[in-house]
Amino acid sequence: MFRSQFTTLLGLFSGAWLPTGSGRPGAPATPVQSGTAINQSWTLDPLVPISALGSWEAFLGLQNKQQGTGELQGGGQRVAAGVPLPLAPQEVLQETCKALSFVQVISRPGCTSARVLNHLCFGRCSSFYIPSSDPTPVVFCNSCVPARKRWTSVTLWCGAGQLASPRRVRISTVLVQKCQCRPKL
């Protein structure tokens, strides 16, 4: 995920104002104390991950249902009772996800092998799990996965060393070009 997406996700955790679709911060109807969570409707910035917002809304819904608390605001929106979440911004922004080069050996029984320069995705991505009495807990997991990839064909020579002449066999493989932290699907 990009730094701006994590900043937005952290804003969801801390109860900070989220950007509206116009790019200007939207003010809540009542002042918010630091470290509390609010359940409000916002026009999403295109960079806000939908899965993060859905998980957050589900979390707030669970809080309202379990606690039976919450106050209605002027617009009929429900504010959850204060839910402190002790997260530091640097903890959320410490994601690393890189495409590391390696030589992949493509082979098949009875064929010569071919070597292809490829990339593997390696890194550490954010996740959270919110326990509840509901059978389906709120889970948000990111994984370091390919963000850009392409298919390529590799030619292997098969049957070499036998009486028959060798034949070409084409095999398709994925070449990873870029990696990024993204939600698991």
From Swiss-Prot:
GO biological process entries: atrial septum development; determination of heart left/right asymmetry; determination of left/right asymmetry in lateral mesoderm; determination of left/right symmetry; negative regulation of BMP signaling pathway; negative regulation of nodal signaling pathway; negative regulation of transforming growth factor beta receptor signaling pathway; regulation of transforming growth factor beta receptor signaling pathway
GO-annotated molecular function: morphogen activity
Disruption phenotype: Knockout animals are born at the expected Mendelian rate. However over a third of the homozygous mice die within the first 48 hours after birth, mostly due to cardiac defects. A proportion of surviving animals display multiple laterality defects including randomization of the left-right axis, left pulmonary isomerism thoracic situs inversus and cardiovascular malformations. Knockout animals that do not display a laterality phenotype show a massive enlargement of the ventricular myocardium and a left ventricular systolic dysfunction.
Residues linked to a glycan: 39
One family name in Pfam for this protein: DAN
Annotated signal peptide: 1-23
Primary localization class, coarse: secreted
Induction per the UniProt record: Down-regulation during the establishment of embryonic left-right axis could be due to translation repression involving BICC1 and possibly DICER1 and/or transcript degradation, involving BICC1 and the CCR4-NOT complex. Attenuated DAND5 expression lifts repression of NODAL and defines leftness by induction of the left lateral plate mesoderm NODAL signaling cascade.
Subcellular location: Secreted
UniProt note on tissues of expression: Expressed throughout the neural retina and in the photoreceptor nuclear layer. In the retina, widely expressed in inner nuclear layer, as well as in the ganglion cell layer.
Record function comment: Antagonist of the extracellular signaling protein NODAL, which is required for correct left-right patterning during embryonic development. Antagonist of BMP4 signaling. Antagonist of TGF-beta signaling. Independently of its role in left-right axis establishment, plays a role during heart development, possibly through the regulation of TGF-beta/Nodal signaling pathway. Displays anti-angiogenic activity by inhibiting endothelial sprouting, migration, and proliferation. Once internalized by endothelial cells, may alter their redox and glycolytic balance.
PANTHER family named among the record's database cross-references: DAN DOMAIN FAMILY MEMBER 5
Protein family according to the UniProt entry: Belongs to the DAN family.
Protein name (Swiss-Prot/TrEMBL): DAN domain family member 5
Protein source organism: Mus musculus (Mouse)
Organism taxonomic ancestry: Eukaryota, Metazoa, Chordata, Craniata, Vertebrata
